Protein backbone atom coordinates (compact mmCIF):
# COMPACT_ATOMS: atom_id res chain seq x y z
CA UNK A 1 0.00 0.00 0.00
CA UNK A 2 2.84 2.39 0.88
CA UNK A 3 4.56 1.74 -2.44
CA UNK A 4 1.44 2.62 -4.41
CA UNK A 5 1.01 5.80 -2.38
CA UNK A 6 4.62 6.74 -3.11
CA UNK A 7 4.13 5.98 -6.79
CA UNK A 8 1.03 8.15 -7.04
CA UNK A 9 2.75 10.95 -5.12
CA UNK A 10 5.80 10.76 -7.40
CA UNK A 11 3.64 10.84 -10.52
CA UNK A 12 1.68 13.79 -9.16
CA UNK A 13 4.84 15.77 -8.44
CA UNK A 14 6.34 14.86 -11.82
CA UNK A 15 3.25 15.91 -13.75
CA UNK A 16 2.61 19.12 -11.80
CA UNK A 17 6.17 20.45 -11.52
CA UNK A 18 6.74 22.11 -14.84
CA UNK A 19 8.23 25.38 -13.61
CA UNK A 20 11.66 24.29 -12.34
CA UNK A 21 13.80 21.69 -14.06
CA UNK A 22 15.48 20.60 -10.82
CA UNK A 23 12.20 19.53 -9.20
CA UNK A 24 11.25 17.62 -12.35
CA UNK A 25 14.57 15.79 -12.43
CA UNK A 26 14.39 14.94 -8.72
CA UNK A 27 10.88 13.55 -9.06
CA UNK A 28 11.99 11.51 -12.07
CA UNK A 29 14.86 10.05 -10.03
CA UNK A 30 12.40 9.27 -7.23
CA UNK A 31 10.16 7.40 -9.66
CA UNK A 32 13.09 5.40 -11.04
CA UNK A 33 14.26 4.50 -7.53
CA UNK A 34 10.72 3.42 -6.67
CA UNK A 35 10.56 1.30 -9.82
CA UNK A 36 13.88 -0.31 -8.87
CA UNK A 37 12.63 -1.14 -5.39
CA UNK A 38 9.42 -2.61 -6.82
CA UNK A 39 11.38 -4.84 -9.18
CA UNK A 40 13.82 -5.98 -6.50
CA UNK A 41 11.17 -6.69 -3.87
CA UNK A 42 9.07 -8.68 -6.31
CA UNK A 43 12.14 -10.83 -7.14
CA UNK A 44 11.70 -9.98 -10.79
CA UNK A 45 15.32 -8.96 -11.32
CA UNK A 46 18.49 -10.95 -10.91
CA UNK A 47 21.55 -9.30 -9.41
CA UNK A 48 23.27 -8.57 -12.74
CA UNK A 49 20.10 -7.00 -14.14
CA UNK A 50 19.83 -4.85 -11.03
CA UNK A 51 23.36 -3.54 -11.55
CA UNK A 52 22.66 -2.81 -15.21
CA UNK A 53 19.46 -0.98 -14.27
CA UNK A 54 21.31 1.08 -11.66
CA UNK A 55 24.09 1.89 -14.15
CA UNK A 56 21.58 3.17 -16.69
CA UNK A 57 19.86 5.16 -13.94
CA UNK A 58 23.14 6.80 -12.95
CA UNK A 59 23.83 7.69 -16.60
CA UNK A 60 20.35 9.21 -16.87
CA UNK A 61 20.95 11.24 -13.73
CA UNK A 62 24.29 12.51 -15.01
CA UNK A 63 22.75 13.55 -18.33
CA UNK A 64 19.93 15.35 -16.53
CA UNK A 65 22.45 17.12 -14.32
CA UNK A 66 24.49 18.22 -17.34
CA UNK A 67 21.36 19.60 -19.01
CA UNK A 68 20.54 21.45 -15.78
CA UNK A 69 24.04 22.92 -15.52
CA UNK A 70 24.04 24.06 -19.15
CA UNK A 71 20.58 25.63 -18.68
CA UNK A 72 21.69 27.51 -15.57
CA UNK A 73 24.89 28.69 -17.27
CA UNK A 74 23.03 29.98 -20.32
CA UNK A 75 19.98 31.54 -18.68
CA UNK A 76 20.95 32.03 -15.03
CA UNK A 77 17.99 30.09 -13.68
CA UNK A 78 16.56 26.58 -13.75
CA UNK A 79 13.09 27.76 -14.67
CA UNK A 80 11.73 26.08 -17.77
CA UNK A 81 9.97 29.25 -18.94
CA UNK A 82 13.36 30.69 -19.98
CA UNK A 83 13.68 27.96 -22.62
CA UNK A 84 11.01 29.60 -24.79
CA UNK A 85 12.90 32.88 -25.08
Curated annotation (Swiss-Prot):
From the UniProt record, which GO molecular function terms apply? NADH dehydrogenase (ubiquinone) activity
What EC number(s) does the entry state? 7.1.1.2
The GO cellular component terms are:
mitochondrial membrane
Q: How does it sit in the membrane?
A: Multi-pass membrane protein
Q: Where in the cell is it found?
A: Mitochondrion membrane
Assigned keywords, A-Z: Electron transport, Membrane, Mitochondrion, NAD, Respiratory chain, Translocase, Transmembrane, Transmembrane helix, Transport, Ubiquinone
Q: Read off the Gene3D superfamilies from this record.
A: 1.10.287.3510
Q: Which residues cross the membrane?
A: 21-41, 51-71
Record flagged with keyword Translocase: yes
What reaction gets catalysed by this protein?
a ubiquinone + NADH + 5 H(+)(in) = a ubiquinol + NAD(+) + 4 H(+)(out)
Top-rank lineage group of the source organism = Eukaryota
Give the family per the record.
Belongs to the complex I subunit 4L family.
> Which function does this protein serve?
Core subunit of the mitochondrial membrane respiratory chain NADH dehydrogenase (Complex I) that is believed to belong to the minimal assembly required for catalysis. Complex I functions in the transfer of electrons from NADH to the respiratory chain. The immediate electron acceptor for the enzyme is believed to be ubiquinone.
Record protein name field? NADH-ubiquinone oxidoreductase chain 4L
- From which organism does this entry originate? Artemia franciscana
